[in-house]
Amino acid sequence: CALPIFPVIPTVHYNMGGIPTNWKGQVLNPTQKDENKIVNGLWAAGEAACSSVHGANRLGANSLLDIVVFGKACSENISEICKPGDKIEECDIQQLNNDILTNKNYLSRKGDLNVADIRLEMQKTMQKHAGVFRNDKLLEEGVKKLSEIYKLFDRVSIDDKSNVFNTEYIEMLELKNLLDNSLITMHSANYRKESRGAHSHQDYPERDDKNWLSHTIAHLNNGNVILSKRNVIRKVLDDDVKAIPLAKRVY
């Protein structure tokens, strides 16, 4: 008898990166003068954060390190800094109001595109142009295609306008986050001219520690991606454990 054929393809289950943090979970905003500049009052842990422990290819089961170790580190650091009776620092109320208004407008705006169609185009573009094996041509084309798809989000609207249990609205917010993440990923992959860890570049098959032993720092503003580098942390906190020297990953 004939059996149905099921396609088997690779897909994403982990992001090799995230919000830059130090080992205490404090969020960093790297600058040219200070690549370890701390954002006061903001912490991140788990798979959303990048504390420079995984390198370019996380080993299996090491997500527990993100969650358990750095989750605990965050709580300990917060308890050290924040004391009972401390006042919350003043914040930019106008910026907060702008963010709230932007998200509210998603409910009311009218458009000619739906979430599912844009999400599918984004998925196809990422699968084709930022898949397991990459090259300059694919990545450059991917940057252009994804930039166009990113702009289409402004034409997306939803039918459900309610404020309670609105799954359409949740999917719309998820799409915005996915587009942000995808655009940064595509630009960052095109930026890195080497092969390292999960980034396998056919035009640059070797690892290049001289030029690319660094994190890629990406800032996204209205669809424009600005990229820079941040040094990889190679120093240990104490003398009990020695730093592991660089070596080729072979099997």
Region spans (language model):
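Short Gly/Pro-enriched turn/cap motifs at secondary-structure boundaries
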Residues: 8-11, 16
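Glycine- and aromatic-enriched mobile tails/lids
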Residues: 14, 26-44, 48-251
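Proline- and acidic/polar-enriched loop/turn elements at helix boundaries
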Residues: 6-7, 205
